[in-house]
Amino acid sequence: MASMFKSLVGGIHNCNLSLLRTVLPMRLQTTIGNEINLHGVGLHRGEYASVTLKPAAPGTGIRFVRVRDGQHDAYVRASYDCVTDTMLCTTLDNHAPNGARAQVRTVEHLMAAIHVCGIDNLDVVLPQEEVPIMDGSATLFVEAIHRAGTVHLNAVARQWVVKQLIEIKDGARYAALQPHPYFALDFTIVYDNPVIGTQSVQVDEFDNLEELVMPARTFGLMRDVEMMRTH
């Protein structure tokens, strides 16, 4: 799954992309207005977990800060080329040598919230590897970011336009990005379990993501729990 994800997102970088301000209106980069502190449980370890979101300067991007012994020990970029695993959660790795290496896990709901809220620059401070799972969805992250507010920075944000079809297949799984005049999402899951079964969602406006997608919760099977807590 990690290779499929990296192939799809990497394809965005490798295809003919342009920064088209004639198509996408120029906008300023953003960060949050106030520091955010959240805590809960890590999904995989079942242990207490906390996260602090801090405003960041233009050009920082989304950066995870791993804290060990009270020190900011290592940085992990939220970038497709840092994805090392997508089995049951998304894992990012900074690929640094020796003691500077760090990983962060279960970042997907937080990253979705950051994107939906339009935040470009953020330091995400973690004293443990896992982001707290909160209520199993992205909603509590979205609400916290809204409360903190958005600050516009004195730098122009990069906005990319997909210029050609990108398709990735992995067995029965399929994902594609294709040129379109506006944001649209069409997603279907077919799961061999009567509780989940087949479910679909279609979103034709970016602003509808918060209502239609952010409340979607992680689900799991009991047979996976022990494996999750030992990996």
Residue map of PLM features:
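C-terminal regulatory domains involved in ligand/effector binding and gene-expression control
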Residues: A2-D120, V125-H231
